[in-house]
Amino acid sequence: MTNMDKLYEAVEARGPVCVGLDTDFSYLPADFVDSTLTRGEIIVRFNQKLIDATKAVAGCYKVQIAYYESLGLEGMKAYADTLKAVREAGVPVIADIKRGDIAKTAEMYAMGHFTGDFEADFVTLAPYMGLDSISPYLPYAEKQGKGLFVLCRTSNGGAKDFEYEKLADGRHVYDLVGDKLNALGKDYMGEHGYSSIGLVIGGTHIEEATEIRAKYKDSFFLIPGYGAQGGKAEDIAQYLTKGNGGVVNSSRGILLAYKKQPGTAFDEAAYNECVNMKEAIAHACSLL
Protein backbone atom coordinates (compact mmCIF):
# COMPACT_ATOMS: atom_id res chain seq x y z
CA MET A 1 0.00 0.00 0.00
CA THR A 2 1.35 3.42 -0.97
CA ASN A 3 1.26 6.53 1.16
CA MET A 4 -1.27 7.94 -1.28
CA ASP A 5 -3.48 4.92 -0.52
CA LYS A 6 -3.08 5.66 3.17
CA LEU A 7 -3.98 9.30 2.58
CA TYR A 8 -7.07 8.24 0.65
CA GLU A 9 -8.12 6.04 3.58
CA ALA A 10 -7.42 8.85 6.06
CA VAL A 11 -9.72 11.15 4.09
CA GLU A 12 -12.39 8.45 4.00
CA ALA A 13 -12.13 8.09 7.77
CA ARG A 14 -11.64 11.68 8.92
CA GLY A 15 -12.32 14.01 6.01
CA PRO A 16 -10.15 16.09 3.64
CA VAL A 17 -8.91 18.80 6.01
CA CYS A 18 -5.15 19.31 5.77
CA VAL A 19 -3.95 21.23 8.82
CA GLY A 20 -1.12 23.53 7.79
CA LEU A 21 1.48 23.85 10.53
CA ASP A 22 2.95 27.02 9.06
CA THR A 23 3.63 28.17 12.59
CA ASP A 24 4.91 31.73 12.75
CA PHE A 25 6.00 32.63 16.27
CA SER A 26 3.80 35.73 16.09
CA TYR A 27 0.73 33.47 15.77
CA LEU A 28 1.12 32.12 19.29
CA PRO A 29 -1.10 33.48 22.07
CA ALA A 30 0.91 35.78 24.33
CA ASP A 31 0.02 33.81 27.44
CA PHE A 32 1.39 30.62 25.86
CA VAL A 33 4.90 31.97 25.43
CA ASP A 34 7.23 30.65 28.15
CA SER A 35 10.31 32.84 28.52
CA THR A 36 12.32 29.92 29.91
CA LEU A 37 12.09 28.05 26.58
CA THR A 38 13.52 28.75 23.14
CA ARG A 39 11.23 29.84 20.33
CA GLY A 40 11.67 26.44 18.72
CA GLU A 41 10.66 24.61 21.88
CA ILE A 42 7.60 26.81 22.30
CA ILE A 43 6.52 26.20 18.70
CA VAL A 44 6.82 22.44 19.19
CA ARG A 45 4.63 22.65 22.30
CA PHE A 46 2.09 24.72 20.36
CA ASN A 47 2.12 22.30 17.42
CA GLN A 48 1.81 19.29 19.71
CA LYS A 49 -1.32 20.71 21.34
CA LEU A 50 -2.80 21.44 17.92
CA ILE A 51 -2.03 17.92 16.72
CA ASP A 52 -3.55 16.37 19.83
CA ALA A 53 -6.67 18.51 19.45
CA THR A 54 -7.24 18.02 15.72
CA LYS A 55 -5.92 14.56 14.80
CA ALA A 56 -9.39 13.01 14.96
CA VAL A 57 -10.68 15.37 12.26
CA ALA A 58 -7.57 15.90 10.13
CA GLY A 59 -6.92 13.94 6.97
CA CYS A 60 -3.29 15.00 7.14
CA TYR A 61 -0.90 17.74 8.23
CA LYS A 62 1.36 19.91 6.09
CA VAL A 63 4.50 21.40 7.61
CA GLN A 64 5.95 24.36 5.70
CA ILE A 65 9.69 24.21 6.23
CA ALA A 66 10.35 27.94 5.72
CA TYR A 67 8.74 28.83 9.04
CA TYR A 68 11.25 26.59 10.78
CA GLU A 69 14.30 27.44 8.66
CA SER A 70 13.81 31.08 9.60
CA LEU A 71 14.66 30.21 13.22
CA GLY A 72 17.99 28.59 12.37
CA LEU A 73 19.16 25.45 14.14
CA GLU A 74 16.49 25.58 16.84
CA GLY A 75 13.89 25.94 14.12
CA MET A 76 15.10 22.91 12.24
CA LYS A 77 14.98 20.87 15.43
CA ALA A 78 11.41 22.11 15.88
CA TYR A 79 10.68 21.04 12.30
CA ALA A 80 12.03 17.53 12.95
CA ASP A 81 10.15 17.28 16.25
CA THR A 82 6.91 18.43 14.59
CA LEU A 83 7.21 15.84 11.81
CA LYS A 84 7.87 13.19 14.45
CA ALA A 85 4.83 14.28 16.47
CA VAL A 86 2.54 13.96 13.46
CA ARG A 87 3.91 10.57 12.51
CA GLU A 88 3.52 9.36 16.11
CA ALA A 89 -0.11 10.51 15.97
CA GLY A 90 -0.61 8.11 13.06
CA VAL A 91 -1.63 10.81 10.59
CA PRO A 92 -0.03 11.35 7.16
CA VAL A 93 2.36 14.31 6.96
CA ILE A 94 3.39 16.43 3.98
CA ALA A 95 6.74 18.21 4.06
CA ASP A 96 6.08 21.43 2.18
CA ILE A 97 9.60 21.99 0.84
CA LYS A 98 8.93 22.87 -2.85
CA ARG A 99 12.32 21.66 -4.01
CA GLY A 100 13.09 21.97 -7.71
CA ASP A 101 16.71 21.06 -8.40
CA ILE A 102 18.10 18.19 -10.48
CA ALA A 103 20.59 15.33 -10.47
CA LYS A 104 22.73 14.74 -7.38
CA THR A 105 21.31 17.76 -5.56
CA ALA A 106 17.78 16.41 -5.95
CA GLU A 107 18.97 12.97 -4.83
CA MET A 108 20.25 14.56 -1.63
CA TYR A 109 16.98 16.43 -1.11
CA ALA A 110 15.06 13.19 -1.58
CA MET A 111 17.26 11.36 0.90
CA GLY A 112 17.06 14.25 3.35
CA HIS A 113 13.26 14.41 3.36
CA PHE A 114 12.33 10.76 2.88
CA THR A 115 14.77 9.34 5.45
CA GLY A 116 16.35 10.40 8.72
CA ASP A 117 15.41 13.26 11.03
CA PHE A 118 13.25 15.05 8.44
CA GLU A 119 11.40 12.01 7.11
CA ALA A 120 7.90 12.72 5.84
CA ASP A 121 5.28 10.73 3.96
CA PHE A 122 5.05 13.27 1.13
CA VAL A 123 7.03 16.21 -0.21
CA THR A 124 6.03 19.12 -2.41
CA LEU A 125 8.11 19.79 -5.52
CA ALA A 126 8.48 22.50 -8.17
CA PRO A 127 8.78 21.07 -11.72
CA TYR A 128 10.10 24.11 -13.61
CA MET A 129 13.48 22.51 -14.43
CA GLY A 130 11.83 19.45 -15.95
CA LEU A 131 11.05 15.84 -15.16
CA ASP A 132 14.65 15.28 -14.09
CA SER A 133 13.78 17.40 -11.06
CA ILE A 134 11.12 14.79 -10.19
CA SER A 135 12.83 11.51 -11.09
CA PRO A 136 15.30 11.42 -8.14
CA TYR A 137 12.33 11.09 -5.78
CA LEU A 138 10.71 8.21 -7.66
CA PRO A 139 12.81 5.37 -6.19
CA TYR A 140 11.32 6.29 -2.80
CA ALA A 141 7.83 6.14 -4.31
CA GLU A 142 8.58 2.77 -5.88
CA LYS A 143 10.33 1.12 -2.93
CA GLN A 144 8.78 2.82 0.11
CA GLY A 145 5.46 4.11 -1.19
CA LYS A 146 6.41 7.75 -0.60
CA GLY A 147 4.30 10.40 -2.29
CA LEU A 148 4.89 13.63 -4.19
CA PHE A 149 2.74 16.70 -4.68
CA VAL A 150 4.02 18.68 -7.65
CA LEU A 151 3.06 22.29 -8.33
CA CYS A 152 0.70 22.44 -11.30
CA ARG A 153 -1.92 25.18 -11.11
CA THR A 154 -1.44 27.23 -8.00
CA SER A 155 -3.68 29.67 -6.16
CA ASN A 156 -1.36 32.69 -5.97
CA GLY A 157 -1.95 35.78 -8.07
CA GLY A 158 1.44 35.50 -9.75
CA ALA A 159 0.51 32.13 -11.25
CA LYS A 160 -0.60 34.03 -14.33
CA ASP A 161 2.99 35.11 -15.03
CA PHE A 162 4.00 31.60 -16.15
CA GLU A 163 1.36 28.94 -15.51
CA TYR A 164 -1.36 30.62 -17.59
CA GLU A 165 0.80 31.34 -20.63
CA LYS A 166 -0.50 29.61 -23.76
CA LEU A 167 1.46 27.16 -25.86
CA ALA A 168 1.34 26.85 -29.64
CA ASP A 169 -1.19 24.00 -29.40
CA GLY A 170 -3.59 26.08 -27.31
CA ARG A 171 -2.82 24.46 -23.99
CA HIS A 172 -1.56 26.45 -21.01
CA VAL A 173 1.77 25.81 -19.33
CA TYR A 174 -0.09 24.27 -16.38
CA ASP A 175 -1.79 21.85 -18.80
CA LEU A 176 1.60 20.75 -20.10
CA VAL A 177 2.87 20.22 -16.55
CA GLY A 178 -0.23 18.31 -15.50
CA ASP A 179 -0.27 16.16 -18.64
CA LYS A 180 3.37 15.12 -18.28
CA LEU A 181 3.01 14.34 -14.57
CA ASN A 182 -0.23 12.46 -15.17
CA ALA A 183 1.50 10.28 -17.76
CA LEU A 184 4.50 9.71 -15.48
CA GLY A 185 2.21 8.75 -12.62
CA LYS A 186 0.71 5.80 -14.52
CA ASP A 187 3.70 3.73 -13.41
CA TYR A 188 3.07 4.47 -9.73
CA MET A 189 -0.59 3.62 -9.22
CA GLY A 190 -1.96 2.57 -5.85
CA GLU A 191 -4.73 0.27 -4.72
CA HIS A 192 -7.34 3.04 -4.61
CA GLY A 193 -6.75 4.28 -8.14
CA TYR A 194 -4.47 7.21 -7.41
CA SER A 195 -0.87 7.71 -8.42
CA SER A 196 1.93 8.41 -5.95
CA ILE A 197 2.51 11.60 -7.97
CA GLY A 198 -0.12 14.09 -6.87
CA LEU A 199 -0.72 17.63 -8.05
CA VAL A 200 -0.95 20.95 -6.26
CA ILE A 201 -4.11 22.52 -7.67
CA GLY A 202 -5.25 25.82 -6.18
CA GLY A 203 -8.87 25.90 -5.08
CA THR A 204 -9.52 29.32 -6.60
CA HIS A 205 -10.17 28.39 -10.26
CA ILE A 206 -13.78 27.32 -9.98
CA GLU A 207 -14.54 27.94 -13.65
CA GLU A 208 -12.29 25.01 -14.62
CA ALA A 209 -12.50 22.82 -11.52
CA THR A 210 -14.69 20.09 -12.98
CA GLU A 211 -12.56 19.88 -16.12
CA ILE A 212 -9.32 19.62 -14.12
CA ARG A 213 -10.76 16.91 -11.86
CA ALA A 214 -11.97 14.85 -14.83
CA LYS A 215 -8.73 15.30 -16.76
CA TYR A 216 -6.51 14.17 -13.90
CA LYS A 217 -8.75 11.58 -12.32
CA ASP A 218 -5.75 9.43 -11.30
CA SER A 219 -4.04 12.29 -9.48
CA PHE A 220 -4.63 13.09 -5.83
CA PHE A 221 -4.81 16.86 -5.30
CA LEU A 222 -3.28 19.03 -2.61
CA ILE A 223 -5.62 22.00 -2.67
CA PRO A 224 -4.46 25.31 -1.20
CA GLY A 225 -6.50 28.49 -1.33
CA TYR A 226 -9.28 27.70 1.17
CA GLY A 227 -10.30 30.56 3.44
CA ALA A 228 -7.60 33.23 3.51
CA GLN A 229 -7.03 33.03 -0.27
CA GLY A 230 -10.73 33.11 -1.11
CA GLY A 231 -11.56 29.46 -1.79
CA LYS A 232 -15.03 28.46 -0.55
CA ALA A 233 -16.40 25.03 0.31
CA GLU A 234 -18.70 24.99 -2.71
CA ASP A 235 -15.69 25.71 -4.93
CA ILE A 236 -13.44 23.16 -3.26
CA ALA A 237 -16.03 20.40 -3.65
CA GLN A 238 -15.61 20.59 -7.42
CA TYR A 239 -12.01 19.37 -7.09
CA LEU A 240 -12.97 16.27 -5.11
CA THR A 241 -14.48 12.95 -6.15
CA LYS A 242 -17.25 11.92 -3.77
CA GLY A 243 -15.48 13.89 -1.05
CA ASN A 244 -12.10 12.27 -1.66
CA GLY A 245 -9.27 12.48 -4.18
CA GLY A 246 -7.75 15.51 -2.51
CA VAL A 247 -6.90 17.26 0.72
CA VAL A 248 -7.75 20.88 1.41
CA ASN A 249 -5.13 22.91 3.21
CA SER A 250 -5.83 25.63 5.74
CA SER A 251 -3.03 27.13 7.77
CA ARG A 252 -3.77 30.58 9.19
CA GLY A 253 -7.47 29.83 9.36
CA ILE A 254 -6.79 27.01 11.81
CA LEU A 255 -3.71 28.33 13.62
CA LEU A 256 -5.37 31.68 14.30
CA ALA A 257 -8.91 30.41 14.84
CA TYR A 258 -8.70 31.38 18.52
CA LYS A 259 -8.69 35.06 17.53
CA LYS A 260 -12.19 34.66 16.11
CA GLN A 261 -13.43 32.64 19.09
CA PRO A 262 -12.90 34.87 22.14
CA GLY A 263 -12.48 32.99 25.38
CA THR A 264 -11.70 29.71 23.62
CA ALA A 265 -8.32 27.99 24.04
CA PHE A 266 -6.29 27.98 20.83
CA ASP A 267 -6.30 24.20 20.49
CA GLU A 268 -10.04 23.95 21.03
CA ALA A 269 -10.60 26.78 18.56
CA ALA A 270 -8.44 24.96 16.00
CA TYR A 271 -10.54 21.82 16.48
CA ASN A 272 -13.74 23.82 16.02
CA GLU A 273 -12.40 25.36 12.81
CA CYS A 274 -11.43 21.93 11.45
CA VAL A 275 -14.89 20.57 12.20
CA ASN A 276 -16.59 23.57 10.59
CA MET A 277 -14.37 23.25 7.52
CA LYS A 278 -14.92 19.49 7.26
CA GLU A 279 -18.69 19.85 7.58
CA ALA A 280 -18.87 22.71 5.07
CA ILE A 281 -16.95 20.73 2.46
CA ALA A 282 -18.99 17.57 3.12
CA HIS A 283 -22.22 19.54 2.70
CA ALA A 284 -20.98 21.11 -0.53
CA CYS A 285 -19.99 17.68 -1.86
CA SER A 286 -23.43 16.29 -1.02
CA LEU A 287 -25.04 18.89 -3.28
CA LEU A 288 -23.10 17.86 -6.39
Regions found by a protein language model. Name each.
Residues 70-85, 102-107, 129-142, 204-213, ...:
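Active-site-adjacent beta->alpha loops and helix N-cap segments on the catalytic face
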Residues 199, 203-249, 253-257:
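A C-terminal functional module that forms or caps the active site or interfaces directly
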Residues 8-11, 83-87, 138-142, 182-186, ...:
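Surface-exposed amphipathic alpha-helices with a cationic face
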Residues 13, 58, 115-121, 142-148, ...:
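Glycine-enriched alpha-helix->loop->beta-strand junction motifs that scaffold or abut catalytic
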Residues 22-26, 66-68, 98-102, 128, ...:
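Active-site beta-loop-alpha junctions enriched in small/polar residues
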Residues 97, 101-198:
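Conserved anion-binding
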Residues 1-63, 68-81, 85-92, 262, ...:
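Conserved N-terminal beta1-alpha1 strand-loop-helix module at the mouth
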Residues 19, 61, 96, 123, ...:
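Conserved, mostly hydrophobic/aromatic
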